[in-house]
């Protein structure tokens, strides 16, 4: 089976859900990757740069990997009116994964990885979607408070208007990325519900959902993070929210900017994430042995 990702569209009721998929025989687990705002599943298979692809790296380690177009993106972009409730978005995403990689063929389970605005959906999937099948969660490009420059830019955002200076903010510093990406090579129209989810994320939804996560969590922070506060104190505050998680790791990624999975340091970042997945697999096996021995 080819390790090159291929597009998939599956129907969840009357709503088409799309994404990029790479499948391996007898997968050790399934990695589900959730992109951030204003992009698509292609974020995890960097166009023209296969070495930077999370999906290809995952397959080389024995994992099936699914990069979903979040509800409101890709094939579901025409169904915005159905997507305002977070419960509906979780239902669509989980059912899409079930169609692509049915339960019983996922190896040890599902590992969820998300970037930026995708963290809301991934964490909701972890606590309300897959139940006990979740091995762990990787979050990147998120936090609890905006940096001053980001606050100034994002304060201009409305439901109908992309704020001036947003691209420069998200892709700073530009020398850390392939040049074609900085000029919009991965851009996609934003989902209509994102203004609300972004507004409520740091103060309400992130802390509330984090407290319900019961699996290991890694939060990756770019050395040159340009959106969220990433001081040691800020990172510790994020980690402290995961009160029910057995393990929380803060991973500082050298030579990287906000868009970790498409920067020139993406391969190193992905290899680290895959090591964390390995640790989650070991922890899961340890729990199985303990249950069998008790």
Regions found by a protein language model. Give the residues of each.
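Catalytic histidine-centered segment of alpha/beta-hydrolase-like enzymes
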Residues: 256-266
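N-terminal cap/lid segment of alpha/beta-hydrolase-fold proteins
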Residues: 1-25
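Glycine-rich "HGGG/HGxG" loop immediately N-terminal to the catalytic nucleophile
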Residues: 42, 69-84, 258-259
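Conserved alpha/beta-hydrolase
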Residues: 51-77
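Conserved loop-alpha-helix segment in the C-terminal half of the alpha/beta-hydrolase fold
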Residues: 223-256
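Short, surface-exposed "cap/lid" segments of acyl-processing enzymes
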Residues: 26-60
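Short beta-strand/loop motif that positions the catalytic acidic residue
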Residues: 213, 219-221
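Conserved acidic catalytic loop of the alpha/beta-hydrolase fold
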Residues: 90-108
């Amino acid at each position: 089976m080819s390790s090159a990702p291929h597009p998939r569209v599956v129907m969840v009721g009357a709503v088409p859900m799309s994404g990029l998929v790479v499948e391996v025989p007898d997968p050790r687990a399934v990695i589900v990757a959730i992109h951030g705002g204003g992009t698509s599943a292609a974020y995890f298979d960097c166009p023209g740069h296969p070495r930077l692809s999370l999906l290809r790296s995952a397959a080389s380690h024995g994992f099936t990997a699914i990069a979903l177009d979040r509800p409101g993106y890709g094939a579901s972009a025409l169904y915005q009116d159905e997507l305002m409730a977070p419960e509906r978005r979780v239902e669509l995403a989980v059912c899409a994964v079930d169609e692509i990689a049915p339960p019983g063929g996922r190896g040890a389970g599902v590992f969820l990885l998300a970037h930026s605005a995708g963290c809301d959906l991934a964490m909701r999937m972890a606590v309300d979607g897959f139940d006990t099948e979740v091995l762990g969660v990787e979050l990147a490009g998120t936090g609890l408070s905006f940096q001053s420059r980001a606050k100034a830019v994002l304060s201009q955002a409305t439901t109908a208007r992309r704020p001036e200076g947003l691209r420069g903010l998200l892709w700073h510093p530009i020398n850390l990325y392939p040049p074609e990406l900085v000029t919009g090579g991965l851009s996609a129209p934003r989902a209509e519900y994102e203004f609300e989810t972004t507004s409520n994320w740091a103060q309400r939804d992130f802390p509330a959902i984090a407290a319900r996560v019961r699996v290991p969590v890694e939060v990756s922070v770019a050395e040159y993070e340009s959106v969220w506060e990433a001081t040691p104190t800020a990172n510790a505050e994020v980690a402290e929210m995961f009160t029910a998680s057995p393990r929380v790791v803060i991973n500082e990624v050298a030579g990287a900017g906000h868009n970790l999975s498409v920067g020139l340091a993406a391969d190193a970042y992905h290899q680290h994430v895959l090591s964390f997945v390995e640790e989650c697999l070991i922890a899961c096996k340890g729990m199985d042995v303990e249950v069998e021995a008790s």
